[in-house]
A protein has these predicted regions:
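ER/Golgi luminal nucleotide-sugar-dependent glycosyltransferases, focusing on the catalytic module
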Residues: 1-221
Length: 221
């Protein structure tokens, strides 16, 4: 084991699928001697503990109730000396070694353009008069597809309330991180920690969906 990289996986296991096994297996197959932390999110069935490879995997039985966000912070605060962190959901299967992306401070493989409104809109794929088209779409089109807003007004209010715990603010547009799933350097997480971003902890699925947006906001400010 070395402190080059740490894989952090949030897991809620109820026995209905093999996601956590497939996820950890894919990491072990693509990386030499990886260090994997599985943070249990208060799973009703903990029998999976016995079926994970103890050579590479450490399970944190911490009864995490704050979804992926809580799992990420629990693992980072316990293991804060690694160079690179892979923050993953147990539904992810890695198909190849991604260490080439470790040269970046932050990597997200799926992201989406967001706005500080409910709903979204579809933009014609052209560079011609793009700024004017963007302005017109915001002004005239309440329903969108290519740019994603929030699902509910309550999510916006919760997000704005949580951001008050930090120096970050709600912009009009930004890139959100799907999942949120990402690879980042140690100093990226430390900066979030210094700015109290670890104080934003979702307690339900709707709030966790907001974290895709909030992580994106924090990373871009």
């Amino acid at each position: 084991m070395n402190e080059k990289r740490l894989f952090v996986i949030s897991c809620f296991f109820d026995g209905t699928n093999d996601a956590i096994f497939n996820c950890t297996k894919s990491i072990i197959e693509n990386y030499k001697n990886p260090k994997i932390i599985v943070v249990d999110s208060n799973s009703p069935d903990k029998s999976y503990y016995n079926n994970l490879d103890p050579k590479h995997i450490e399970i944190l039985d911490v009864k995490n109730k704050n979804y992926d966000t809580g799992a990420y912070w629990i693992a980072f605060k316990k293991y804060n000396t690694y160079d690179n962190y892979y923050f993953l959901q147990d539904s992810i299967k890695i198909k190849e070694n991604l260490s080439s992306f470790e040269k970046n401070d932050l990597t997200s493989f799926r992201y989406f353009l967001s706005i500080n409104k409910v709903g979204g809109f579809k933009i014609e794929k052209t560079k011609k008069n793009f700024i004017k088209r963007l302005f017109d779409f915001f002004k005239k089109n309440p329903k969108i597809h290519d740019i994603f807003g929030y699902d509910f007004e309550e999510q916006i209010l919760w997000s704005m309330e949580q951001l008050q715990k930090t120096p970050y603010f709600m912009p009009k547009t930004w890139l959100s991180l799907f999942g949120p799933i990402f690879i980042c350097k140690n100093h990226v997480m430390k900066k979030l920690l210094e700015n109290n971003f670890d104080q934003i902890l979702p307690t339900n699925k709707i709030q966790q969906m907001c974290m895709e947006r909030l992580f994106g906001i924090a990373f871009q400010q």
